[in-house]
Amino acid sequence: MAGNGALRRSAREKCWEARDAYFGCLDRHSILDGLKDDTKAAQACSAEKTAFETDCVKSWVNYFLKFRVQQHQQQEAIKKLEAQGAKKLN
């Protein structure tokens, strides 16, 4: 989606759908970081990547890709702590 203007709800939903499809493809090909592994991601998920980059503002694409990695790292850290006996605080 070109431009820096505010996205309408339908445009945001289209972006989110494209993001989810791209991330689903990355998951199927065991690719976590779409930025670091850009070449591999482009080969495995070219149609989904193109749709994601077309339907979302560039800053959103970068944000979503970085957030995906951060979220994974956070989940891995939680699993490690739980394996060491850490308890969740309420």
Curated annotation (Swiss-Prot):
<dbReference type="InterPro" id="IPR048280">
    <property type="entry name" value="COX6B-like"/>
</dbReference>
<keyword id="KW-1015">Disulfide bond</keyword>
<dbReference type="GO" id="GO:0033617">
    <property type="term" value="P:mitochondrial cytochrome c oxidase assembly"/>
</dbReference>
<comment type="similarity">
    <text>Belongs to the cytochrome c oxidase subunit 6B family.</text>
</comment>
<feature type="domain" description="CHCH">
    <location>
        <begin position="12"/>
        <end position="64"/>
    </location>
</feature>
<dbReference type="Pfam" id="PF02297">
    <property type="entry name" value="COX6B"/>
</dbReference>
<dbReference type="InterPro" id="IPR036549">
    <property type="entry name" value="CX6/COA6-like_sf"/>
</dbReference>
<dbReference type="GO" id="GO:0005758">
    <property type="term" value="C:mitochondrial intermembrane space"/>
</dbReference>
<keyword id="KW-0539">Nucleus</keyword>
<keyword id="KW-0496">Mitochondrion</keyword>
<feature type="disulfide bond">
    <location>
        <begin position="25"/>
        <end position="45"/>
    </location>
</feature>
<feature type="disulfide bond">
    <location>
        <begin position="15"/>
        <end position="56"/>
    </location>
</feature>
<protein>
    <recommendedName>
        <fullName>Cytochrome c oxidase subunit 6B-like protein new16</fullName>
    </recommendedName>
</protein>
<keyword id="KW-0963">Cytoplasm</keyword>
<feature type="short sequence motif" description="Cx10C motif">
    <location>
        <begin position="45"/>
        <end position="56"/>
    </location>
</feature>
<dbReference type="GO" id="GO:0005634">
    <property type="term" value="C:nucleus"/>
</dbReference>
<feature type="short sequence motif" description="Cx9C motif">
    <location>
        <begin position="15"/>
        <end position="25"/>
    </location>
</feature>
<comment type="function">
    <text>Involved in cytochrome c oxidase complex assembly and is required for efficient formation of respiratory supercomplexes comprised of complexes III and IV.</text>
</comment>
<dbReference type="InterPro" id="IPR048281">
    <property type="entry name" value="COA6_fun"/>
</dbReference>
